[in-house]
């Protein structure tokens, strides 16, 4: 008989290398020992997102590695998932991966800005925002961001907006900054 589930740290240490070789990183591990059967959820992301095929491949690899642990219970549910659209964007890497996506950003002065994520540096993000009837780029220091969440869109964005974000054809970013 086994003694229980591995810790979050053990799961990250065990699976981190395998996920990294596949081009993904583990963002979080949630272990629910109270669920029946117990559940281990691994949240992973990569520069190009995590599609269903990659999640299935990672899940098979993770299951094989976890099954080798002598501390794990006989029956458990393993889930490998992407962070989802409701995950707050916190790091430059999160913003880079969200390039081209529409976000709501709460700033340290309690103002809110809605825009499309453009180029992200180590200390700033460029948001494509409405400027009257046109589009403009607003540079925001990451230190001023209190909260940022990707918004679900039900209609396609304007081509000019995508181009300014650097994801829709010609890159007019430098032209609009002048």
UniProtKB/Swiss-Prot annotation:
<dbReference type="InterPro" id="IPR003728">
    <property type="entry name" value="Ribosome_maturation_RimP"/>
</dbReference>
<comment type="similarity">
    <text>Belongs to the RimP family.</text>
</comment>
<protein>
    <recommendedName>
        <fullName>Ribosome maturation factor RimP</fullName>
    </recommendedName>
</protein>
<keyword id="KW-0690">Ribosome biogenesis</keyword>
<dbReference type="GO" id="GO:0005829">
    <property type="term" value="C:cytosol"/>
</dbReference>
<keyword id="KW-0963">Cytoplasm</keyword>
<dbReference type="Pfam" id="PF17384">
    <property type="entry name" value="DUF150_C"/>
</dbReference>
<dbReference type="Pfam" id="PF02576">
    <property type="entry name" value="RimP_N"/>
</dbReference>
<dbReference type="InterPro" id="IPR028998">
    <property type="entry name" value="RimP_C"/>
</dbReference>
<dbReference type="GO" id="GO:0000028">
    <property type="term" value="P:ribosomal small subunit assembly"/>
</dbReference>
<dbReference type="InterPro" id="IPR036847">
    <property type="entry name" value="RimP_C_sf"/>
</dbReference>
<dbReference type="GO" id="GO:0006412">
    <property type="term" value="P:translation"/>
</dbReference>
<comment type="function">
    <text>Required for maturation of 30S ribosomal subunits.</text>
</comment>
<dbReference type="InterPro" id="IPR035956">
    <property type="entry name" value="RimP_N_sf"/>
</dbReference>
<dbReference type="InterPro" id="IPR028989">
    <property type="entry name" value="RimP_N"/>
</dbReference>
């Amino acid at each position: 008989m086994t003694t229980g589930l591995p810790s979050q740290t053990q799961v990250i240490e065990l699976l981190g290398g395998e996920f990294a070789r596949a081009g993904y990183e583990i963002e979080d591990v949630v272990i629910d020992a109270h669920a029946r059967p117990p559940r281990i959820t691994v949240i992973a992301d990569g520069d190009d997102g995590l599609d269903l095929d990659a999640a299935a491949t990672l899940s098979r690899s993770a299951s094989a590695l976890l099954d080798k642990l002598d501390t794990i219970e006989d029956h458990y549910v393993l889930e490998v998932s992407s962070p989802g659209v409701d995950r707050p964007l916190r790091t430059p890497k999160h913003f880079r991966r969200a390039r081209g996506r529409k976000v709501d950003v709460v700033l340290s002065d309690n103002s809110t800005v809605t825009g499309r994520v453009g180029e992200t540096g180590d200390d700033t993000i460029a948001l494509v925002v409405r400027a009257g009837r046109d589009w403009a780029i607003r540079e925001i220091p990451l230190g001023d961001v209190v909260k940022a969440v990707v918004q679900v869109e039900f209609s396609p964005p304007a081509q000019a907006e995508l181009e300014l974000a650097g994801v829709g054809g010609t890159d007019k970013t430098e032209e609009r900054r002048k």
